[in-house]
Amino acid sequence: MRILPISTIKGKLNEFVDAVSSTQDQITITKNGAPAAVLVGADEWESLQETLYWLAQPGIRESIAEADADIASGRTYGEDEIRAEFGVPRRPH
């Protein structure tokens, strides 16, 4: 993540937008030496918002920890078991 003063960004905004749009890079923009804004690409912003949404769901952290423990102890299900459980037929080859 780069930190740049607003004076650097002003004349080259298009260039910096292109840079963050094509990467997961973020640019912290300072004003009078203090952080004032962060420039991120739209895809990265959407991803961050989705992550925040899921992390805000009650019990999600516990569910993830439980799933990790299941995987670590070998309690997993194969494709055939999942398809049978939910009544999903196999795809034709």
UniProtKB/Swiss-Prot annotation:
Domain of life where this protein originates: Bacteria
Biological process (GO), any one: positive regulation of growth
Gene3D superfamilies linked to this entry: 1.10.1220.170, YefM-like domain
Alphabetical list of Pfam families matching this protein: PhdYeFM_antitox
Keyword DNA-binding in annotation: yes
Annotated family: Belongs to the phD/YefM antitoxin family.
Job description of the protein: Antitoxin component of a type II toxin-antitoxin (TA) system. Upon expression in M.smegmatis neutralizes the effect of toxin RelE2.
Record-annotated disulphide pairs: none
Subunit structure of this chain's protein: Interacts with toxin RelG, which neutralizes the toxin. Also interacts with toxins RelE and RelK in vitro, in M.smegmatis coexpression with non-cognate toxins increases the toxicity of RelE but not of RelK.
Protein name, UniProt field: Antitoxin RelF
InterPro entries (alphabetical): Antitoxin_Phd/YefM, phD/YefM_antitoxin, YefM-like_sf
Keyword check for Oxidoreductase: no
Gene Ontology molecular function: DNA-binding transcription factor activity; sequence-specific DNA binding; toxin sequestering activity
Keyword list, A-Z: DNA-binding, Repressor, Toxin-antitoxin system, Transcription, Transcription regulation
Induction details: Expressed in log phase cells. Also expressed in human macrophages 110 hours after infection. A member of the relFG operon.
